[in-house]
From Swiss-Prot:
This is Alpha-galactosidase. The active site is at 185 (nucleophile), 240 (proton donor). Keywords: Disulfide bond, Glycosidase, Hydrolase, Signal. It comes from Oryza sativa subsp. japonica. One of its GO terms (cellular component) is plant-type cell wall.
């Protein structure tokens, strides 16, 4: 770089003014972020800042992923017939048309050992036709096939190999089979760091798996929300969910703290849905689905959709709630108000709208009020409030209140008039 001459004259007032204007122009966007702008403009600036942080971009996950995963209901008891019948059921029940597109095989799909060339071998008893044939079947239904591996020597079941030190080989295999999604778990790590192991697979995916959605399942142990956007399309922020109220609510709370890191192309993941597995009440499942939708969490069904009840189907197929999850603005809703288990969760949507959930985590009926000041609306703003579970609309101004049953919720979209 050339040095300035020591004999050069001081800058002119005009030059100083131009420099000040240039500096102000660079600072203005960040200063403006403190202003009271619309949800769209805030979201656009936020997405721009996030895009500059991201190095992983495969064009996938512009909205949170939707589909089905085998683990919560079947654990290791899976086979190719279940996967085929699940794909059929997603189509026949209308769930596929609502956006549930991924049919994801979890752990236990492969033989215990690799073949002589070091390749995965699909389990000969449970997947005798192989994964390629299964992918072809699922694709013919207009759906996508997902598969599972692990950033370790074995998967979490200890019944099949992991992908550690086989990353490129395995991604090439998955791509050759037509796999569309990879869930990548975190067991049997051989004492090697999370960053090393997930970076290796991310690099392999960038080179050989560009059309494969990459879901990191690190369990939130090392704050993946702060770094996984450089590596994949979603990242677990919590440990495994269980089919009970305490587990579901704690996962919601743990995930909430990382809201600023989610957005189009990369999402926080508080784990799969338990709706329909029988461990919670209808009200609790409705709350579960509503909070996951508001928080822009992946909507991955975890029950047996071949035999689900009408009650379960009604929850999973609420198109108005799904629309909140899939909104193009892509901003994760958050807990904005809490009073002894009576909570308000809210977030911005496209077209200046707001999504609001009134959530009663107490064991008694209670009235919950969301004040405009807590959800980013001026007090004078009048809205049309759409109740997403009652499928009815009404006018509101300044606040919205409802009597909410124990462990239940009310969910609204507010559209300024």
């Amino acid at each position: 770089m050339a040095r300035a001459s020591s004999s050069s004259s001081p800058p002119s007032p005009r030059l100083l003014l131009l420099l000040l204007v240039a500096v102000a122009a660079t600072l203005l966007p960040e200063a403006a972020a403190l202003g009271n702008f619309t949800a769209e403009s805030r979201g656009a600036r936020w997405r721009s800042r996030r895009a500059r942080r991201r190095a992983f971009e495969n064009g996938l996950g512009r909205t949170p992923q939707m589909g089905w995963n085998s683990w919560n209901h079947f654990y290791c008891g899976i086979n190719e017939q279940i996967i085929r019948e699940t794909a059929d059921a997603l189509v026949n029940t209308g769930l596929a048309k609502l956006g549930y597109q991924y049919v994801n095989i979890d752990d236990c799909w492969a033989e215990y050992s690799r073949d002589s060339q070091g390749n995965f071998v699909p389990n000969r008893q449970t997947f005798p036709s192989g994964i390629k044939a299964l992918a072809d079947y699922v694709h013919a239904k207009g759906l996508k096939l997902g598969i599972y591996s692990d950033a370790g020597s074995q998967t979490c079941s200890n019944k099949m190999p992991g992908s550690l030190d086989h990353e490129e080989q395995d991604v090439k295999t998955f791509a050759s089979w037509g796999v569309d999604y990879l869930k990548y778990d975190n067991c049997n790590d051989a004492g090697r760091s999370v960053m090393e192991r997930y970076t290796r697979m991310s690099n392999a995916m960038k080179t050989y798996g560009k059309n494969i959605f990459f879901s990191l399942c690190e369990w939130g142990k090392e704050n993946p929300a702060t770094w996984a956007g450089r590596m994949g399309n979603s990242w677990r922020t919590t440990g495994d969910i269980a089919d009970n109220w305490g587990s579901m609510t704690s996962r919601a709370d743990e995930n909430d703290q990382w809201a600023a890191y989610a957005g189009p192309g990369g999402w926080n993941d508080p784990d799969m849905l338990e709706v329909g597995n029988g461990g919670m009440s209808e009200a609790e499942y409705r709350s579960h689905f509503s909070i996951w939708a508001l928080a822009k969490a992946p909507l991955l069904i975890g029950c047996d959709v071949r035999s689900m009840s009408q009650q379960t189907k009604n929850i999973l197929s609420n198109s108005e709630v799904i629309a909140v999850n899939q909104d193009s603005l892509g901003v994760q809703g958050k807990k904005v108000q809490s009073d002894n288990g009576l909570e308000v969760w809210a977030g911005p949507l496209s077209n200046n709208r707001k999504a609001v959930v009134l959530w009663n985590r107490q064991s008694y009926q209670a009235t919950i009020t969301a004040h405009w000041s807590n959800i980013g609306l001026a007090g004078s703003v009048a809205v049309t409030a759409r109740d997403l579970w009652a499928h009815s609309s009404f006018a509101a101004q300044g606040q919205i209140s409802a009597s909410v049953a124990p462990h239940d919720c009310k969910m609204y979209v507010l559209t300024p008039n």
